[in-house]
UniProtKB/Swiss-Prot annotation:
Gene Ontology BP term (one): D-gluconate metabolic process
UniProt KW keywords: Gluconate utilization, NADP, Oxidoreductase, Pentose shunt
Protein name, per record: 6-phosphogluconate dehydrogenase, decarboxylating
PANTHER family: 6-PHOSPHOGLUCONATE DEHYDROGENASE
Lineage: Eukaryota, Amoebozoa, Evosea, Eumycetozoa, Dictyostelia
Length: 493
């Protein structure tokens, strides 16, 4: 009897890798598995994979030999040099037309390079974003594949089978994103938006707890209620759960109150913020969210500064509150929703700029649909983003779409009230206030940049355009009126 061949091989049996192949096997695919620590292969095949269609492999040679052609090998390993290391080990074992898939959180430029390098060797490469964490990998993640388009037909049946499904019609949260590094780029932007969402929620929590004095029980009920409306999303849902969790050893203490207020980060938010500068897009909310995590890491310095620097104590703001709690709760909800809309608008504007810069053909409406299920930023209004781009594929900014415009208009009063409360009571809300500032800047017909241009011309002779002739010849002025050179050769800002 001929031994069964694997439909796909997976390298890297950490939790994400294990859950992905369990998902694949549950959809009818036979999976060959390999891990550098070979005992991990045996543990998996005899443990979680026992009695299922898995082929355990103790070498890369065995893995490759066990696969149907064209061979599909998926890497679920640490991003960076480790991916390149395994690619180099696989190359002598593969044939032209075989496919290597990187499912880790790789930088999009690495995926772009790998696509080109492997194409020259006859190997098809896919760099794919996989979102949803451990649970998503097992039950259905959002998958964002990019790379060599010739590879897509060979992995599409597997990826769309294992991805999350949404209504109507069980649509898969997986479709081809674009060439080269496009898949990992979209995943990077997804992660940046995730940073923003988490920071916005934490700022809403801070105001509700420290300004209004809500208990954890009240916070749980508030977020659970919010999850039934416009804010219905995965992160709001899990936040409500977090406020309900008590310590096992001390049932009178909530877990959230025992956690050190110093946030970690893996770097994908930083990548997003850096690239926003490269493509010239003000991704202010994501950048502030990254910086907020940086500030949080200075715990000892903050504790010292709290006894030195003047200003209202944000942790004791609730001692002065005497107003209508329900009204402020609604204002915070409005601020959270409006700021969230700004974050997504900035993210999609950035993807448009990147598509132009890197010559990708991105379908923004379809990208929004990829995020409707399985992923960390899934939320109900993603369908509205799809609708906005269906109505106007050339839409410059989601904020100008009628649905977004009307929602932002309805949230104005609460949004501005929350920003005012934060400033007056010393409550740090960098994401809320940066979102509002971006919104006000974007809708301002005439900004203060004319003075910036004048200053640049004064010290650096950088010239400027005239208001009544914006596309005319650059102008330089002798600002002192005393003749001679007024510009510095030292500065170029």
């Amino acid at each position: 009897m001929t031994e069964a061949k694997g439909d796909i091989g997976l390298i890297g049996l950490a939790v994400m890798g294990e859950n992905l192949v369990l998902n694949m096997e549950s959809r009818g695919f036979t999976c060959s598995v390999y891990n550098r620590t070979t005992s991990k292969v045996d543990e998996f095949v005899q443990g979680r994979g026992k009695g299922k269609k898995f082929i355990g492999c103790h070498s890369l040679e065995t893995l490759v030999q066990s696969l149907k052609t064209p061979r599909r090998v998926m890497l679920m390993v640490k991003a960076g040099e480790v991916v390149d290391h395994f690619i180099q080990l696989l190359l002598p074992l593969l044939e032209k037309g075989d496919i290597i898939i990187d499912g880790g959180n790789s930088l999009y430029t690495d995926s772009d390079r790998r696509t080109k390098d492997l194409d020259a060797k006859g190997i098809l490469f896919i760099g794919t974003g996989v979102s949803g964490g451990e649970e998503g990998a097992l039950l259905g993640p959002s998958i964002m594949p990019g790379g060599n388009p010739k590879a897509w037909e060979h992995v599409k049946p597997i990826f769309q089978a294992i991805s999350a499904k949404v209504q109507p019609g069980d649509q898969p949260c997986c479709d081809w994103v674009g060439d080269g590094g496009a898949g990992h780029y979209v995943k990077m932007v997804h992660n940046g938006i995730e940073y923003g969402d988490m920071q916005l929620i934490s700022e809403a929590y801070f105001i509700l707890k420290h300004y209004l004095g809500l208990s954890n029980d009240e916070l749980q009920k508030t977020f659970a209620k919010w999850n039934t409306g416009d804010l219905d999303s995965y992160l709001i849902e899990i936040t409500a759960d977090i406020f309900a969790k008590k310590c096992e050893k001390d049932p009178n203490t909530y877990v959230v109150d025992t956690i050190l207020d110093s946030a970690g980060q893996k770097g994908t938010g930083k990548w997003t913020a850096i690239n926003a500068l490269d493509v010239g897009i003000p991704l202010t909310l994501v950048a502030e969210s990254v910086f907020a995590r940086c500030v949080s890491s200075f715990k000892e310095e903050r504790v010292k500064a709290s006894t030195i620097l003047a200003g209202p104590n944000p942790n004791e703001a609730n001692k002065k509150f005497t107003g209508d709690k329900e009204q402020v709760i609604e204002a915070v909800r409005q601020a959270l929703f409006a700021s969230k809309l700004v974050s997504y608008a900035q993210g999609f504007t950035m993807m448009k700029a990147a598509a132009k810069e890197y010559k990708w053909n991105l379908n923004y409406g379809n990208i929004a649909l990829l995020w409707r299920g399985g992923c960390i930023i899934r939320s109900t209004f993603l369908g509205e983003i799809k609708g906005a781009f269906d109505k106007n594929p050339q839409l410059d900014n989601l904020l100008t779409d009628c649905w977004f415009r009307d929602k932002l208009a309805a949230a104005q009063d609460g949004w501005r009230q929350v920003a005012s409360i934060s400033v007056l009571h010393g409550i740090p809300t960098p994401a809320f206030t940066s979102a509002l500032s971006y919104y006000d800047s974007y809708r301002c017909a005439k900004l203060s940049a004319n003075l910036v241009q004048a200053q640049r011309d004064y010290f650096g002779a950088h010239t400027f355009q005239l208001l009544d002739d914006p596309k005319g010849a650059p102008v330089h002025v002798n600002w002192t009126g005393r003749g001679g050179s007024t510009h510095s050769t030292t500065y170029s800002i």
